[in-house]
A protein has these predicted regions:
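Sequence termini and other peripheral, non-core segments
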Residues: 1-76, 80-196
């Protein structure tokens, strides 16, 4: 669970997602938004997993949404708490989700199934979401790459922890990913005073 906040602009941020994240994060952002709808607008009930463990679930009164949205997941994860705390947060993730769907089509020449299933329904904000100003998403990453600036931190996270698999099909490698020789050289790419 994460929100790869690689740029303040959700469209540019989506373009900066590496190939693996373009595929994966479309689903994850849809999961975050689905969870926001269920937790904010749904009715809580107890269910059982396949292993007969108790689990909290939320049922939506709108049968169309109930039957299409993903189940609530990781409700206490900082990214989930953040997205459902503000309409501006939800809107940012939705805009990045749509941009990622476009990015997926650009890179792979086809439409992601999650786009077909959820793009239209997720454009609607949860009914009970608060209207507040935007704050940067939480930095869900190891402490050694965190900084006081969330965009810088997520770019550091990519440089240090995602460099071994990160590639960009039909896109130029982002400037912040160029000339990286290893994890030990992180200080070359950032001002050490930015560490939190």
């Amino acid at each position: 669970m994460n929100i790869f906040y690689l740029d303040n602009d959700p469209i540019k941020s989506a373009e900066l997602h590496c190939d693996k994240h373009v595929v994966k994060m479309i689903i994850e952002y849809a999961q975050l938004m689905s969870t926001a709808h269920r937790v904010l607008d749904g009715e809580l009930y107890e269910d059982r997993t396949a292993n007969n463990r108790r689990i909290k679930r939320w049922r939506l009164s709108d049968s169309n949404m109930e039957n299409v949205l993903y189940k609530a997941s990781h409700i206490n994860h900082p990214s989930n708490i953040w997205i459902r705390s503000s309409d501006s947060h939800y809107q940012f993730v939705y805009d990045m989700f749509v941009a990622l769907c476009n990015e997926y089509t650009h890179r792979y020449g086809r439409v992601h199934l999650t786009e077909e299933k959820l793009k239209d329904i997720l454009q609607h904000l949860p009914n009970n979401i608060a209207s507040t100003d935007f704050v940067d998403p939480p930095q869900a990453m190891p402490d050694d790459v965190k900084t006081s600036d969330a965009v810088d931190a997520y770019q550091n996270y990519y440089r240090v922890y995602k460099k071994d698999f990160a590639k960009w099909t039909d896109r130029e490698t982002p400037a912040f990913m160029k000339n990286i020789s290893g994890k030990d050289n992180l200080s070359k790419y950032m001002d050490e005073e930015l560490y939190v």
